Amino acid sequence: MESGASIQALNGATGEVLWQYNRSLPESLRNGQQSRMKNLAIYGDALYAPTPDGHVIALETKTGKVIWDHAVMSPDAAGAAPFSMTGGPVVAKGKVIIGTSLGINTPGGNYIVGLDATSGEESWRFNTIAKPGEPGGDSWNGAPFEERYGGGVWTSGSYDPVRNLVYFGTGNTYDVGTLMLPQKRVGESRDALYTDSTLALNPDTGKLVWHSQHMKRDVWDLDWVFEQSLLTLPVNGKPTELVVTGGKTAIFAAMDRSTGKHVFSRDLGLQNIVTSIDPATGEQIPNPALEPEPGKTKLLCPNFNGARNWPTTAFNPASYILYVPLVETCADYSWTPRSPGQIAAGGDDIHAATRPRPDGDGKFGRIEAINLATGKVLWIHRQRAPLVSSLLATAGDLVFVGALDRFFSAYHAGTGELLWQTQLNAAPNSSPVTYSVQGEQYVAVVSGGGGPLSSGSASLTPEIDNPAGGTTLWVFKLPSR
């Protein structure tokens, strides 16, 4: 378990602390209070984790002893890292692979690195923002490299050992002004590769095998950075191995794992930005009326946090049901143009004030159970409190999720009926897990620590008391049958 500058190993049955790793950080990082890490990785006898100061470390799983410590990036004058590594690593074929995010004031955009799992040495680096003169480099409206930002990778990737591919999602650009300018010259597009894309990389070399850009020229902060689920679904009566992902708009795209070819899309109906999706290519056509205009505020659904965000979905491979945590929101969206010099200095130029949907009824939290193979919705649960945790689905037909009102709840996977809930000290804004010890089944979730989902939804439900609280691990034992 990670919290700020510390990592703890606990006895899963008793909660006893087995070891703790504490990292010394520059004063500017406030002991890692602002850091967010979504996962750790274990490979062999080593545990791998990013740190708030831009390093990746390997620890012995049994003792917490440092095996190696590698600086992925150089700190600034105040000791802060120019990028974050909030997604956590994935390990494939002896490579620890992790992406960077933010870098809102760092031109050139983000990247994904592959480190040797034994030594920590960097093996390769892939830039998620295409450079001029390289493949995709002509998709930035002719902007020089120092005016290209974003492409953050702030969730972990997935690995397919059969195809030897790792899949990552990317975010948007941080300054839309580059893409709003008139086309500078023939042959230059404004697609902004490789933002809002699924990337398939060779883990040995970091070479791009294929990419699929879900939203070209994203000027609305619609990140497609979330989990890349490796699923097998019937397509035209034949079991087909797919990679499935969904963006902030709660549109899900299914692609062939080997080629990236579009297979199908599912729109859950909580957005007003995309008016149509090409069934052959998956290209999403945005509503031209929502094009940013200086001095004009426009209604955008969802808000910048999205109808969905980093909280992961859960999938039942037997029934093909995907369980999706959602928040029903909109935003008043505006754009302030900036000069090329201001763009090169960093920062962002779009703004959004969260607001309820015009057709809303005061309920913002939503769980949707959808058959991915057919598109049929099995059930929907709606409630006032926005959801702030990943979903956990179990073989015992339970679905667990946490909400802003501090409740951690279990629902029947087949019907959506509420079966159990308990209120914690703070919002359970993490990814719950389940495990067994000596035949006993447990469910664990972390609460507290704040985060953008908790703060970004707070204005919708001002009556909900959600104290920041200290980070707390809660563990529940499931009753024996």
Residue ranges of model-derived segments:
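Beta-strand initiation motifs
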Residues: T14-W19, T63-W68, S119-S123, T205-V209, ...
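Blade-level signature of beta-propeller repeat domains, shared across WD40, Kelch, NHL, RCC1
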Residues: P432-R481
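Repeat-blade elements of multi-bladed beta-propeller folds
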Residues: M1-S6, N31-V56, A81-N105, G109, ...
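Structural motif
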Residues: P107-Y111, G177-T178, T195, I251-A253, ...
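Beta-propeller blade signature
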Residues: L59-G64, G109-E122, V186-G206, M255-G260, ...
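Phosphate/diphosphate-binding loops
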Residues: S229-D278, P292-N303, R308, A413, ...
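Extracytoplasmic beta-rich repeat domains
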Residues: Q20-A41, V66-G88, N127-S156, T173-D175, ...
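Beta-propeller domains
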Residues: E2-S24, D204-G206
